[in-house]
Curated annotation (Swiss-Prot):
Enzyme class: hydrolase
Organism: Capsicum annuum (Capsicum pepper)
EC number(s) from the headed UniProt entry: 3.2.1.26
GO biological process: one example: sucrose metabolic process
GO MF entry, a single one: beta-fructofuranosidase activity
Known glycosylation sites: N152, N219, N491, N612
UniProt protein name: Acid beta-fructofuranosidase AIV-18
Propeptide positions: 1-99
Taxonomic lineage: Eukaryota, Viridiplantae, Streptophyta, Embryophyta, Tracheophyta
Lumenal side: 55-640
Entry keywords, A to Z: Disulfide bond, Glycoprotein, Glycosidase, Hydrolase, Membrane, Signal-anchor, Transmembrane, Transmembrane helix, Vacuole
Length: 640
């Protein structure tokens, strides 16, 4: 018999990680109610540093040359591209060789997250086929059981009762048939009206041709869905004429068509440089005429997602729902630039066509789900709480040798709810699922700070490496009304980061910083003047000084974000050691940062609030919660 969800108690469970050599396995990462005691002398040094910074000097946010023990290593080989999927290794810009850093085991162990989902060891990428079944949330994921690099892709499987605490299960599917022998790649789940679960996934054949295959649970009454059967008639779809054999992958969840009993699904592809979404009718797997949508110049579309959102209320919708008060979201992961783009529009099921509300914001040329390290996202409808939930892959941006040393690579984002932004009419709102708040430890620390131009203040928290912060910022109205003097054409990625000062920015928080601010990751707002002369807000995450190690990504992520009349500038950050997920204005703009500090680790991480503007006084209001660790461990199958 399968264990019922109610018999799993996270309060009495233990997390098991795979620790590096020389590091004792201490079991569950300790609760973060009180991580360490700061000595009086340390407090004195911190206050002294803060005083020096505040003494008529702007924050120490300038870029400096790193000093580190460096070695040259061979260039990282390409992985995945030759088989027809996106590049799976982070490519340093240094050419034929790259600079690597000598990481200690303590540093690498610190990088492992405490409440984001990741396997015990080895490589992980795309989230696959998320669903809810008989009391359990199921997450499948691309996994290499042999190594911390991409290859031998298998479907990992885990279950949860709350999307936060997870139990690893045996592999759902392995590459063991001619039609998937080179990889059981990304797929989606469709739940039929009678409760039958159909999983459609891409297989890489023995001839490296991308085909679509069906699988289904061997025992639908099993809440854990432990055993899966591959359909004997696989493959059910092969690349159609005019489509490359390596340009046909990642089927979506199916939805009901206009004809009785008809089911439709879409698959990403390209024709030349035009990204397209093909549509198939599933009763006989017939390719329908035309395409659901196409956008020239966007290249190969991977991991396409297509679903409805309500313009009237805050509930999520089943993928097949259509009617009044409905918009549809088309999302594609762009192989050319490794970005997840989306567009909101109207779906005509009779003509099988999607039309964007604003062609200037079309898929691939407009809005992104996340402006940081975030790719291959996948949503599902959660019938338990009537919401649409979004998963995304957070990949590595360090060296492959470092991943091999630590023995794992990549995590999944915290699941997010997705809603239509009724105020703008153009954006989605993404927000961490409410269950993450169950990890909050006690009452929040509440702080209100009046920040003069060029000031920074240390915030004393129990842990500056594992927390949830909500912050709002109010710019003095007199200065804000002088927007005519602000700069025009600001761009996060080309701005110079938090060290670049203007009349109205930057201002925000500094996370995962050491006490001297030699390593820091600022997340901030910057107000500029738009082409129409009105104030335009930007939301940015600056990684340029996030690490003194060479060979890791150091750039500024971000985009503009609508801040409407009467709204304060608001942000929420989930900080989990080497991951920072940042949400602006209720989730209109989101940035995921993957960082690799060398100093701000093992209790040395600090949290600051700052205002590096030259002319604006900013009032910051903050609530900060320390977060407990999630329980992520193997399912006790011996109890079945």
């Amino acid at each position: 018999m399968a264990i019922h969800p109610s018999s799993y108690d996270p309060e009495t469970s233990t997390t098991h990680y795979t620790f590096l050599p020389g590091q004792p396995d201490s079991g569950h990462r300790k609760s973060i109610k009180v991580v360490s005691v700061i000595l009086l002398s340390s407090f004195f040094l911190l206050y002294l540093a803060a005083f020096v910074i505040l003494n008529n000097q702007p924050p120490n946010l300038q870029n400096k040359s790193p000093s580190a023990s460096e070695t040259l290593t061979p260039a990282t080989p390409s992985r995945g591209v030759s088989q027809g999927v996106s590049e799976k290794t982070f490519k340093d810009v240094s050419g034929t060789s790259q600079v690597s850093y000598t990481w200690s085991n303590a540093m690498l162990n610190w990088q492992r997250t405490a409440y984001h989902f990741q396997p015990q060891k080895n490589w992980m990428n795309d989230p696959n086929g998320p669903l809810y079944h008989k009391g359990w949330y199921h997450l499948f994921y691309q996994y290499n059981p042999d190594s911390a690099i991409w290859g031998n892709i298998t479907w990992g499987h885990a279950v949860s009762t709350d999307l936060i605490h997870w139990l690893y299960l045996p592999f759902a599917m392995v590459p063991d048939q001619w039609y998937d022998i080179n990889g059981v790649w990304t797929g989606s789940a469709t739940i039929l009206p009678d409760g039958l679960i159909m999983m459609l996934y891409t297989g890489d054949t023995d001839d490296y041709v991308q085909v679509q295959n069906l699988a289904y649970p061997a025992n639908l009454s099993d809440p854990l869905l432990l055993d899966w059967v591959k359909y004997q008639g696989n493959p059910v779809l092969v690349p159609p004429p005019g489509i490359g054999v390596k340009d046909f992958r990642d089927p979506t969840t199916a939805w009901t068509g206009p004809q009785n009993g008809q089911w439709l699904l879409t698959i990403g592809s390209k024709v030349g440089k035009t990204g397209i979404a093909l549509v198939y009718e599933t009763s006989n797997f017939k390719l329908l005429d035309g395409v659901l949508h196409a956008v020239p110049g966007t290249g190969m579309w991977e991991c396409v997602d297509f679903y409805p959102v309500s313009t009237l209320d805050a509930n999520g919708l089943d993928t097949s729902y259509n009617g009044p008060g409905i918009k549809h979201v088309l999302k594609a992961s762009l192989d050319d630039n490794k970005q997840d783009h989306y567009v909101i529009g109207t779906y005509d099921p009779v003509k099988n066509k999607f039309s964007p509300d604003n062609p200037d914001l079309d898929c691939g040329i407009g809005l992104r789900l996340d402006y940081g390290r975030y790719y291959a996202s996948k949503t599902f409808y959660d019938p338990k709480k009537q919401r649409r939930v979004l998963w995304g892959w957070i990949g590595e941006t360090d060296s492959e040798s470092a991943d091999l040393q630590k023995g794992w690579a990549s995590v999944q984002s915290i699941p997010r709810t997705v809603l239509f932004d009724k105020k703008t009419g153009t954006h989605l709102l993404q927000w961490p699922v409410a269950e993450i708040e169950s990890l909050r430890s006690g009452d929040p620390k509440v702080k209100e700070v009046n920040l003069q131009p060029g000031s920074i203040e240390l915030l004393h928290v129990d842990s500056a490496a594992q927390f949830d912060i909500e912050a709002s910022f109010e710019v003095d109205r007199v200065t804000l009304e002088g927007i005519i003097e602000a700069d025009v054409g600001y761009n996060c990625s080309t701005s110079g980061g938090a060290a670049s000062r203007g009349i109205l920015g930057p201002f925000g928080v500094v996370v995962i910083a050491d006490q001297t601010l030699s390593e820091l990751t600022p997340v901030y707002f910057y107000i500029s003047r738009g082409a129409d002369g009105r104030a335009e807000a930007h939301f940015c995450a600056d990684q340029t000084r996030s690490s003194e190690a060479p060979g890791v990504a150091k750039q500024v992520y971000g985009s503009s974000v609508p801040v409407l009349d009467g709204e304060k500038h608001r942000m929420r950050l989930l900080v989990d050691h080497s991951i920072v997920e940042s949400f602006a204005q209720g989730g209109r703009t989101v940035i995921t940062s993957r960082i690799y500090p060398t100093k701000a680790v093992n209790g040395a991480a600090r949290l600051f609030v700052f205002n590096n503007a030259t002319g604006a006084i900013v009032t910051a209001s903050l609530k900060i919660w320390s977060l407990e660790s999630a329980d992520i461990r193997s399912f006790p199958l011996q109890k079945l």
